[in-house]
């Protein structure tokens, strides 16, 4: 499976799972919100195991850039807060770092 697709799926699963906890603790949502949150976090962890990488830490580090961009998309689409120029600039820097980690020459 394509690494980018796995990372995007993992990001959505992680953000949704964490938001379920946020909703319960910060927004007063019912405790049953934790059940889909836990399932979503388990899916996130599973998806990261599908990434072709010799080292887990490298897979997680590269994923970080995708997570940040997905978090800003969530901020805008779910929470209704438009990312500002600093959010976008920071995300671009993180994506550049993720690209270096993913595709940098090894050896």
Swiss-Prot record:
It is a multi-pass membrane protein. It is found in: Cell inner membrane. Pfam families: UPF0060. The keyword Cytoplasm does not apply. The chain crosses the membrane at residues 5-25, 31-51, 61-81, 85-105. InterPro entries: UPF0060. It comes from the Bacteria. The keyword Transmembrane applies. Keywords: Cell inner membrane, Cell membrane, Membrane, Transmembrane, Transmembrane helix. SUPFAM superfamilies: Multidrug resistance efflux transporter EmrE. Its main location: membrane. GO terms for cellular component: plasma membrane. NCBIfam families: PRK02237.1 (NF002586). Belongs to the UPF0060 family. PANTHER family: UPF0060 MEMBRANE PROTEIN YNFA. HAMAP family: UPF0060. This is UPF0060 membrane protein RPB_2370.
């Amino acid at each position: 499976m394509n690494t980018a697709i796995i990372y995007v799926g993992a990001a959505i699963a992680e953000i949704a799972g964490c938001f379920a906890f946020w909703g319960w603790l910060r927004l007063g949502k019912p405790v049953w919100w934790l059940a889909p949150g836990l399932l979503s976090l388990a899916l996130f962890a599973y998806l990261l195991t599908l990434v072709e990488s010799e080292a887990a830490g490298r897979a997680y580090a590269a994923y970080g850039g995708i997570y940040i961009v997905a978090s800003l998309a969530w901020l805008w689409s779910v929470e209704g807060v438009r990312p500002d120029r600093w959010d976008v600039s920071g995300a671009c820097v993180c994506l550049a770092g993720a690209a270096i980690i993913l595709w940098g020459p090894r050896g």
